[in-house]
Amino acid sequence: MCPDYDQQEDHFVKAIVNTKLILEDGIVWNGAITWEGDRITQVGEADAVVIPDGADVIDAGGLYTAPGLIDIHTHGSTEHLFCEEPTKCAEHFVRHGETTVLPAFYCNLNLEQMVAGARRVREASKSGVGRILDGLYMEGPYMNGQGSNQKYILWGGEIRREEYAPLLEEVCDLARVWAIDPAREGIEGFMADVRERDPQAIFAMGHSHATAADCRRVKKYGVKVQTHHGDSGKAPGKAQGTIGAG
């Protein structure tokens, strides 16, 4: 079951009954759950959950109720990109059980497109289904400077503060994760400036031909995630596979 985000601010008690509850340690086959506002107040076997008088009761008809899925890296739905249509994308993902999403912007967007997209996401996240949008996953601006997919990378060449400063000004409070290529010359200056603005910023390594030494060098800035780490170019040997964006 997916929550009704248009009613999320209501503070009267709601309940889901006649449902199979997926919990951390198993399934409650005849379960019930109550919540008030954004807090779950009871969960368990139906006969052990007290439904208050006047509660808004939803009969699940035997369907499953599960914790919402969290997606920290997705560019859009089957029809739309988050940078262009964040609300339509949010509608798609909440229908599939995702209740927290970080829209991902790729380095094929220029500065103006990233800023405009961030503003759309920020506005969409304030109400309705858009409230599942909990920040940005910045797959850029500084990804792999060599290897595959170069024609789509708009942030190549030298990393300059005057180039990225307007982006940080606009999105640093919204971005949760910044994907970077540790092998890019000048990447440490960019990472240091991000952390100065947001000490809680998380970095992801990806789309990179970095060596182990490159990766160790940037660890101190808060690298906690890896993504697409195997697509930086052709593999050696006969079984080379194909080159792509991930």
Regions found by a protein language model. Give the residues of each.
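Active-site mouth loops of central-metabolism enzymes
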Residues: 72-84, 150-157, 202-204
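Active-site core of metal-dependent hydrolases
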Residues: 169-246
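Divalent metal-coordination and catalytic microenvironments
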Residues: 19, 33, 38, 62, ...
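Conserved phosphate-binding/catalytic loop of the ribokinase/pfkB sugar-kinase fold
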Residues: 145-167
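Histidine-rich, glycine-flanked metal-binding segment
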Residues: 2-14, 21-66
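Charged helix-capping and loop-helix junction motifs
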Residues: 84-87, 116-121, 160-161, 238-244
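Hydrophobic faces of well-ordered beta-strands that scaffold small-molecule active sites
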Residues: 68-74, 101-103, 134-140, 176-180, ...
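Metal-associated gating/positioning segment near the N- to mid-region
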Residues: 60-117
